[in-house]
Amino acid sequence: MQKVTIQEAEHLLQEIISEEDDRFQILIKDERKGVQKLISKWYKQKELAQKEKEKFLEMSKYENALREKGLTYIAGIDEVGRGPLAGPVVTAAVILPEDFYIPGLNDSKKLSEAKRERFYGEIKAKAIAIGVXIVSPQVIDEINIYQATKQAMLDAIANLSCTPEYLLIDAMKLPTPIPQTSIIKGDAKSISISAASIIAKVTRDRMMKELGEKYPAYGFEQHMGYGTKQHLEAIEAHGVLEEHRKSFAPIKDMIQK
């Protein structure tokens, strides 16, 4: 291989997947600083990819154990929006195929918005089934947030196109005959729950951005309904909306004034 330019070396390293590649053996002997920087970057990317693969395998242990027992339709279930002062609680149930693989998958709160959006598209394209349920602030006020979350999870399961054989749920137990396991911080421990958390988070964030357009003075697209200083000041200045949860403090106290 003739001596390549730095740009050509960069393109080659994007193609090379193993140190055993003859082209890599030539590049690693190239003493130019630019090439050595690219080699160092290549090693870091390989290390990151390996860590992501190991993390994904660790997060697949619940699903793999159930598949070894002959189960196929394993649904991960999670919610987003229990804590905010405004907007709905959104839940998702996701059944993934056995060959599903997205390196970097994690709890939706630990991902950037750009990654969440990208993973959302991949999950939608690859999942066997996805069910989503949305519970309004009015229902939350009527039956309380815990019961609303539970009902939303049951609705998300009912909205799946096939009946799950087993449920992996993030920190909840559901009144259903379907066998289940409740996993504390499950969105960081199970790929199915993680996928559900991403579907629920992106769905809710999009809804809150629409509310932000409808009520620009409240900044919903920035705080997603959580009780930030900006949000509380907007409520003081412009009042309580129908999208606010009247049973939540300090909204409840503001209404009673």
From Swiss-Prot:
Gene symbol of the encoding locus: rnhB
Organism annotation: Bacillus cereus (strain AH820)
Function recorded in the entry: Endonuclease that specifically degrades the RNA of RNA-DNA hybrids.
Keyword terms: Cytoplasm, Endonuclease, Hydrolase, Manganese, Metal-binding, Nuclease
Free-text cofactor note: Manganese or magnesium. Binds 1 divalent metal ion per monomer in the absence of substrate. May bind a second metal ion after substrate binding.
Molecular function (Gene Ontology), one example: manganese ion binding
Amino acids binding a divalent metal cation: 78-79, 170
EC number per UniProt: 3.1.26.4
Membrane is among the record's keywords: no
GO BP term (any one): DNA replication, removal of RNA primer
Subcellular location: Cytoplasm
EC main group: hydrolase
InterPro entries the record matches: RNase_HII (IPR022898), RNase_HII/HIII (IPR001352), RNase_HII/HIII_dom (IPR024567), RNaseH-like_sf (IPR012337), RNaseH_sf (IPR036397)
Recorded family membership: Belongs to the RNase HII family.
Keyword Nuclease: yes
Protein name per Swiss-Prot or TrEMBL: Ribonuclease HII
Residue ranges of domain RNase H type-2 in the record: 72-257
UniProt-listed Pfam families: RNase_HII (PF01351)
Catalytic activity: Endonucleolytic cleavage to 5'-phosphomonoester
Transmembrane segments: none
Cofactor(s) this protein requires: Mn(2+); Mg(2+)
Annotated GO CC locations: cytoplasm; ribonuclease H2 complex
